[in-house]
């Protein structure tokens, strides 16, 4: 009789199976949102790759739902750990991008609020800075703020700082 109970404990309940299949569908929907070059980094079967690339074609609600269910079915044979690892990597790179973006925004605000000390600190971090150009942009941004004009120069400062940062990191 203990063998019978042991067999029952190893079987998954219908609810558990449904939860797992639903999780695969959600993961498949997230995969469908990736760009093709990101999908190329994953070890996917050809059928799943085609289904993921076809997903944007299904725009009607029921058709999309049915297609996502099909993707979930195809995902049963996939290496889920590799897919989850890619999403962790993408999320980490997105976090890094956001952190860098916020750091550049702080530099812009510091340059606008601070004086020459802020400019000197920035030039210390970014030695390739064109001081004269940056001073002109700062002066223009302060003038726009005083005149209650749209912050066009402030945007130019951010773009200039971002370009300097990208060139320093070798992204340009």
UniProtKB/Swiss-Prot annotation:
Alphabetical list of SUPFAM superfamilies matching this protein: PSPTO4464-like
Subcellular location per the Swiss-Prot or TrEMBL entry: Cytoplasm
Signal peptide range in chain numbering: none
GO cellular component terms, A-Z: cytosol
Keyword rRNA-binding: yes
Molecular-function annotations in GO: ribosome binding; rRNA binding
Protein name in UniProt: Dual-action ribosomal maturation protein DarP
Species: Azotobacter vinelandii (strain DJ / ATCC BAA-1303)
Gene symbol of the encoding locus: darP
